[in-house]
Amino acid sequence: FLRHVADAALDRLRIAGGGTGGHLYPAIAVARAWMRGGPERRVLFVGTARGIEARVLPREGLPLETISAAGIIGHSIARKGWAAALMVRGIAESIGVIGRFQPHVVLGVGGYASAPAVTAAWLRRRPIVLMEQNVVPGMTNRLLARFAFKVAIALPGAAAHLPPGKIVDTGLPLRGEFTGGPPREASFWEGPLRVLVFGGSQGAHALNEALAEALPLLGEDARRMRFV
């Protein structure tokens, strides 16, 4: 996916969504690859003032425009009505962003901010690509997939939940600081095997519990390992 993005004969990319690191950081990797295509390349993120993007993107030197959006899933009827009103407002704001920035393609990365931004792209007839980082796609990407030209997935299992014929299995885009680093020194491998366990969003608690329950199955091997 990054290779195709970097080689595309396009100049302006708008990235829609965010809210959590799982949505945002792969999008940053795509943005960096896009801009390596030449000095004329421009990228613009669209998110909310409450999401992680409002804190991270200024640090990364990447431009962000904020729109109105709020989550709907798991909230009261009153909250859903309020979120629906924000959705309409966010679509109008996103149409304004499209008019100013004139993107050649819109990339939706998931999260509730993606919904109004991608819907606006569909209304303005802009090519839409979605990026799904999870094995079970979120509600936003499942609903928006019908409008997309392609859906880039990080894990093959996601294809079962998305429209056939649009899937591109690209893997997860990684930022440059996590690839191509120097080889580990020999001392890195000394001592117990160190295992870092972490999950994101809804899977974090379940993953930690599953590991704790599985530790007795390791028997004596567990003494030679350190879990964090």
Question: Model-found features: residue ranges?
Answer:
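Residues at the starts of beta-strands that form the adenosine-phosphate
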Residues: 12, 40-44, 63, 127, ...
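Conserved nucleotide-sugar phosphate-binding/catalytic loop shared by glycosyltransferases and other
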Residues: 12-18, 40-86
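Short amphipathic alpha-helix
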Residues: 23-35
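Glycine-rich phosphate-binding loop signature in dinucleotide/nucleotide-binding domains
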Residues: 38, 97-102, 189-190
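Active-site-proximal region of nucleotide-activated glycan assembly enzymes
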Residues: 41, 122-182
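Donor-nucleotide binding loops and adjacent catalytic segments primarily
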Residues: 51, 56-60, 183, 187-228
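An amphipathic, basic-hydrophobic alpha-helix
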Residues: 74-105
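Glycosyltransferases and closely related glycan-assembly transferases
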Residues: 93-106, 114-129, 142-147
